UniProtKB/Swiss-Prot annotation:
Induction: Expressed in both exponential and stationary phase in rich medium; expression is higher in exponential phase (at protein level). This is Protein YecV.
């Protein structure tokens, strides 16, 4: 579930 976490972080940082 690391990929999901990274996607969420990237969306918030974008």
């Amino acid at each position: 579930m690391s990929i999901f976490r990274i996607h969420l972080d990237g969306n918030k940082k974008a």
